[in-house]
Amino acid sequence: MNNIWWHTKGQGNVHLVLLHGWGLNAGVWRCIDEELSSHFTLHLVDLPGFGRSRGFGALSLADMAEVVLRQAPDKAIWLGWSLGGLVASQIALTHPERVQALVTVASSPCFSARDEWPGIKPDVLAGFQQQLSDDFQRTVERFLALQTMGTETARQDARALKKTVLALPMPEVDVLNGGLEILKTVDLRQPLQNVPMPFLRLYGYLDGLVPRKVVPMLDKLWPHSESYIFAKAAHAPFISHPDEFCHLLVALKQRV
Protein backbone atom coordinates (compact mmCIF):
# COMPACT_ATOMS: atom_id res chain seq x y z
CA MET A 1 0.00 0.00 0.00
CA ASN A 2 1.33 3.47 -0.91
CA ASN A 3 2.24 6.03 1.69
CA ILE A 4 0.77 9.51 1.48
CA TRP A 5 2.80 12.74 1.46
CA TRP A 6 3.28 13.85 5.06
CA HIS A 7 5.37 16.76 6.33
CA THR A 8 6.01 17.59 10.00
CA LYS A 9 7.26 20.95 11.29
CA GLY A 10 7.52 22.65 14.68
CA GLN A 11 8.21 21.14 18.08
CA GLY A 12 5.19 21.94 20.21
CA ASN A 13 4.15 19.48 22.90
CA VAL A 14 0.75 18.99 21.20
CA HIS A 15 0.46 17.46 17.72
CA LEU A 16 -1.92 19.09 15.22
CA VAL A 17 -2.83 17.32 11.97
CA LEU A 18 -4.30 19.47 9.17
CA LEU A 19 -6.44 17.85 6.46
CA HIS A 20 -7.28 19.89 3.33
CA GLY A 21 -10.45 19.92 1.23
CA TRP A 22 -11.58 18.57 -2.13
CA GLY A 23 -9.35 19.16 -5.16
CA LEU A 24 -6.60 20.76 -3.10
CA ASN A 25 -3.44 19.80 -1.18
CA ALA A 26 -1.51 20.76 1.97
CA GLY A 27 -0.32 23.97 0.27
CA VAL A 28 -3.60 25.61 1.36
CA TRP A 29 -2.18 25.98 4.87
CA ARG A 30 0.76 28.12 3.70
CA CYS A 31 -0.74 31.29 5.19
CA ILE A 32 -0.91 29.80 8.71
CA ASP A 33 1.63 26.98 8.93
CA GLU A 34 4.49 29.17 10.23
CA GLU A 35 2.35 30.60 13.02
CA LEU A 36 0.87 27.22 13.99
CA SER A 37 4.23 25.44 13.96
CA SER A 38 5.45 27.87 16.64
CA HIS A 39 2.73 26.46 18.96
CA PHE A 40 2.29 22.85 17.82
CA THR A 41 4.12 19.96 16.21
CA LEU A 42 2.29 20.47 12.92
CA HIS A 43 1.50 17.70 10.46
CA LEU A 44 0.73 18.73 6.87
CA VAL A 45 -0.88 15.99 4.81
CA ASP A 46 -1.92 15.47 1.19
CA LEU A 47 -5.01 13.25 1.28
CA PRO A 48 -4.78 10.00 -0.76
CA GLY A 49 -4.87 10.81 -4.49
CA PHE A 50 -4.43 14.57 -3.96
CA GLY A 51 -1.30 16.73 -4.27
CA ARG A 52 1.83 14.62 -3.85
CA SER A 53 -0.04 11.52 -2.58
CA ARG A 54 -0.20 9.77 -5.93
CA GLY A 55 -1.06 6.19 -6.80
CA PHE A 56 -4.51 6.06 -5.18
CA GLY A 57 -7.85 5.66 -6.91
CA ALA A 58 -11.21 6.78 -5.53
CA LEU A 59 -11.56 5.74 -1.88
CA SER A 60 -14.51 5.51 0.48
CA LEU A 61 -14.45 7.82 3.50
CA ALA A 62 -13.59 4.88 5.80
CA ASP A 63 -10.67 3.78 3.61
CA MET A 64 -9.36 7.33 3.27
CA ALA A 65 -9.39 7.72 7.07
CA GLU A 66 -7.51 4.44 7.56
CA VAL A 67 -4.82 5.39 5.00
CA VAL A 68 -4.27 8.76 6.71
CA LEU A 69 -4.19 7.22 10.18
CA ARG A 70 -1.37 4.81 9.25
CA GLN A 71 1.21 7.64 9.29
CA ALA A 72 -0.29 9.71 12.10
CA PRO A 73 1.12 10.39 15.58
CA ASP A 74 -0.34 8.32 18.42
CA LYS A 75 -2.41 11.25 19.64
CA ALA A 76 -3.17 14.61 18.06
CA ILE A 77 -5.69 17.36 17.57
CA TRP A 78 -7.25 16.57 14.18
CA LEU A 79 -8.41 19.52 12.08
CA GLY A 80 -10.22 18.98 8.79
CA TRP A 81 -11.41 21.59 6.33
CA SER A 82 -14.48 20.85 4.19
CA LEU A 83 -14.04 17.27 2.84
CA GLY A 84 -11.10 16.96 5.26
CA GLY A 85 -13.58 17.61 8.08
CA LEU A 86 -15.38 14.39 7.19
CA VAL A 87 -12.06 12.48 7.21
CA ALA A 88 -11.12 13.92 10.63
CA SER A 89 -14.63 13.13 11.93
CA GLN A 90 -14.41 9.56 10.67
CA ILE A 91 -11.09 9.13 12.51
CA ALA A 92 -12.65 10.54 15.70
CA LEU A 93 -15.49 8.01 15.38
CA THR A 94 -13.38 4.93 14.67
CA HIS A 95 -10.23 5.72 16.71
CA PRO A 96 -11.28 8.15 19.46
CA GLU A 97 -8.22 7.21 21.55
CA ARG A 98 -6.02 8.83 18.86
CA VAL A 99 -7.91 12.16 18.85
CA GLN A 100 -7.22 14.76 21.57
CA ALA A 101 -9.71 17.16 20.03
CA LEU A 102 -11.67 17.33 16.78
CA VAL A 103 -11.85 20.59 14.81
CA THR A 104 -13.96 20.91 11.66
CA VAL A 105 -13.64 23.99 9.45
CA ALA A 106 -16.36 25.01 6.97
CA SER A 107 -17.48 21.41 7.06
CA SER A 108 -20.83 19.68 7.39
CA PRO A 109 -21.56 16.16 8.62
CA CYS A 110 -23.92 15.99 5.66
CA PHE A 111 -22.93 18.29 2.75
CA SER A 112 -25.86 17.25 0.58
CA ALA A 113 -29.25 18.92 1.11
CA ARG A 114 -31.83 16.50 2.57
CA ASP A 115 -35.36 16.82 3.92
CA GLU A 116 -35.27 19.68 6.42
CA TRP A 117 -31.49 19.84 6.16
CA PRO A 118 -29.73 22.72 4.33
CA GLY A 119 -26.81 21.84 2.08
CA ILE A 120 -25.62 21.61 -1.51
CA LYS A 121 -28.38 20.45 -3.84
CA PRO A 122 -27.61 16.87 -4.95
CA ASP A 123 -28.05 17.85 -8.61
CA VAL A 124 -25.34 20.53 -8.20
CA LEU A 125 -22.90 17.89 -6.92
CA ALA A 126 -23.98 15.50 -9.70
CA GLY A 127 -23.42 18.35 -12.19
CA PHE A 128 -19.87 18.83 -10.91
CA GLN A 129 -19.28 15.09 -11.34
CA GLN A 130 -20.56 15.24 -14.93
CA GLN A 131 -18.44 18.30 -15.77
CA LEU A 132 -15.32 16.65 -14.36
CA SER A 133 -15.24 14.26 -17.28
CA ASP A 134 -15.69 17.15 -19.77
CA ASP A 135 -13.21 19.73 -18.45
CA PHE A 136 -11.94 18.94 -15.01
CA GLN A 137 -9.52 21.85 -14.60
CA ARG A 138 -12.30 24.35 -15.27
CA THR A 139 -14.65 22.44 -12.93
CA VAL A 140 -12.12 22.58 -10.09
CA GLU A 141 -11.59 26.31 -10.71
CA ARG A 142 -15.37 26.92 -10.55
CA PHE A 143 -15.55 25.02 -7.27
CA LEU A 144 -12.70 27.16 -5.87
CA ALA A 145 -14.40 30.39 -6.94
CA LEU A 146 -17.53 29.29 -5.04
CA GLN A 147 -15.46 28.93 -1.88
CA THR A 148 -14.43 32.58 -1.56
CA MET A 149 -17.48 34.38 -2.99
CA GLY A 150 -18.78 37.27 -0.92
CA THR A 151 -15.71 38.03 1.20
CA GLU A 152 -13.93 41.39 1.06
CA THR A 153 -10.82 39.60 -0.20
CA ALA A 154 -12.65 37.14 -2.49
CA ARG A 155 -10.50 37.65 -5.57
CA GLN A 156 -7.23 37.47 -3.66
CA ASP A 157 -8.40 34.39 -1.68
CA ALA A 158 -9.51 32.60 -4.87
CA ARG A 159 -6.10 33.35 -6.41
CA ALA A 160 -4.38 31.81 -3.36
CA LEU A 161 -6.46 28.63 -3.71
CA LYS A 162 -5.90 28.43 -7.46
CA LYS A 163 -2.15 28.84 -6.99
CA THR A 164 -2.19 25.94 -4.50
CA VAL A 165 -3.95 23.69 -7.01
CA LEU A 166 -1.79 24.63 -9.97
CA ALA A 167 1.48 24.25 -8.03
CA LEU A 168 1.13 20.44 -8.24
CA PRO A 169 -0.22 17.99 -10.83
CA MET A 170 -4.02 17.84 -10.83
CA PRO A 171 -5.57 14.83 -9.07
CA GLU A 172 -6.92 12.07 -11.32
CA VAL A 173 -10.55 12.45 -12.39
CA ASP A 174 -11.63 9.31 -10.52
CA VAL A 175 -10.09 10.66 -7.28
CA LEU A 176 -11.94 13.98 -7.69
CA ASN A 177 -15.12 12.08 -8.52
CA GLY A 178 -14.68 9.86 -5.46
CA GLY A 179 -14.33 12.95 -3.25
CA LEU A 180 -17.56 14.40 -4.66
CA GLU A 181 -19.27 11.04 -4.07
CA ILE A 182 -18.29 11.28 -0.37
CA LEU A 183 -19.69 14.85 -0.20
CA LYS A 184 -22.88 13.66 -1.93
CA THR A 185 -23.59 10.54 0.15
CA VAL A 186 -22.02 10.69 3.63
CA ASP A 187 -24.16 11.63 6.64
CA LEU A 188 -22.44 11.67 10.04
CA ARG A 189 -25.04 13.74 11.91
CA GLN A 190 -26.16 10.95 14.25
CA PRO A 191 -22.80 9.17 14.81
CA LEU A 192 -21.07 12.42 15.85
CA GLN A 193 -23.53 12.88 18.73
CA ASN A 194 -21.38 10.49 20.74
CA VAL A 195 -17.77 11.61 20.21
CA PRO A 196 -16.07 11.88 23.62
CA MET A 197 -13.32 14.43 22.86
CA PRO A 198 -13.51 18.27 22.75
CA PHE A 199 -15.15 19.20 19.45
CA LEU A 200 -14.81 22.67 17.90
CA ARG A 201 -16.71 23.64 14.73
CA LEU A 202 -15.63 26.71 12.75
CA TYR A 203 -17.77 28.34 10.05
CA GLY A 204 -17.83 31.29 7.66
CA TYR A 205 -20.98 33.44 7.78
CA LEU A 206 -20.80 33.92 3.99
CA ASP A 207 -20.08 30.27 3.12
CA GLY A 208 -21.93 29.22 -0.05
CA LEU A 209 -21.23 25.50 0.43
CA VAL A 210 -22.01 24.98 4.14
CA PRO A 211 -25.04 27.17 4.93
CA ARG A 212 -24.88 28.93 8.30
CA LYS A 213 -28.38 27.57 9.04
CA VAL A 214 -26.73 24.25 9.96
CA VAL A 215 -24.87 25.86 12.88
CA PRO A 216 -27.80 26.19 15.36
CA MET A 217 -29.16 22.82 14.19
CA LEU A 218 -25.85 21.14 15.07
CA ASP A 219 -25.52 23.14 18.31
CA LYS A 220 -28.76 21.43 19.33
CA LEU A 221 -27.84 17.97 17.99
CA TRP A 222 -24.31 18.04 19.45
CA PRO A 223 -24.60 20.03 22.71
CA HIS A 224 -21.12 18.85 23.80
CA SER A 225 -19.51 20.66 20.82
CA GLU A 226 -18.68 24.36 20.44
CA SER A 227 -19.26 26.47 17.34
CA TYR A 228 -17.73 29.73 16.14
CA ILE A 229 -18.73 31.75 13.06
CA PHE A 230 -16.25 34.07 11.31
CA ALA A 231 -18.51 37.03 10.52
CA LYS A 232 -16.87 38.07 7.24
CA ALA A 233 -15.48 34.75 6.01
CA ALA A 234 -16.77 32.33 3.38
CA HIS A 235 -15.57 28.72 2.91
CA ALA A 236 -11.88 29.33 3.70
CA PRO A 237 -11.67 31.36 6.96
CA PHE A 238 -8.01 30.41 7.52
CA ILE A 239 -7.12 32.29 4.30
CA SER A 240 -9.32 35.36 4.86
CA HIS A 241 -8.84 35.56 8.67
CA PRO A 242 -5.54 33.81 9.49
CA ASP A 243 -4.80 35.59 12.80
CA GLU A 244 -8.26 35.01 14.27
CA PHE A 245 -8.13 31.39 13.07
CA CYS A 246 -4.76 30.65 14.70
CA HIS A 247 -5.84 32.37 17.92
CA LEU A 248 -8.80 29.96 18.26
CA LEU A 249 -6.54 26.93 17.82
CA VAL A 250 -3.98 28.15 20.34
CA ALA A 251 -6.83 28.75 22.82
CA LEU A 252 -8.08 25.19 22.19
CA LYS A 253 -4.59 23.84 22.88
CA GLN A 254 -4.70 25.32 26.40
CA ARG A 255 -7.87 23.29 27.08
CA VAL A 256 -6.80 19.81 25.92
Curated annotation (Swiss-Prot):
Gene3D superfamilies: alpha/beta hydrolase
Origin: domain of life: Bacteria
Main subcellular location: cytoplasm
A GO BP entry: biotin biosynthetic process
Cellular localization per UniProt: Cytoplasm
The protein's annotated pathway: Cofactor biosynthesis; biotin biosynthesis
UniProt binding sites for substrate: 22, 82-83, 143-147, 235
Active site annotation, chain numbering: 82 (nucleophile), 207, 235
Cited NCBIfam families: bioH, PRK10349.1
Protein known as: Pimeloyl-[acyl-carrier protein] methyl ester esterase
Annotated source species: Escherichia coli O81 (strain ED1a)
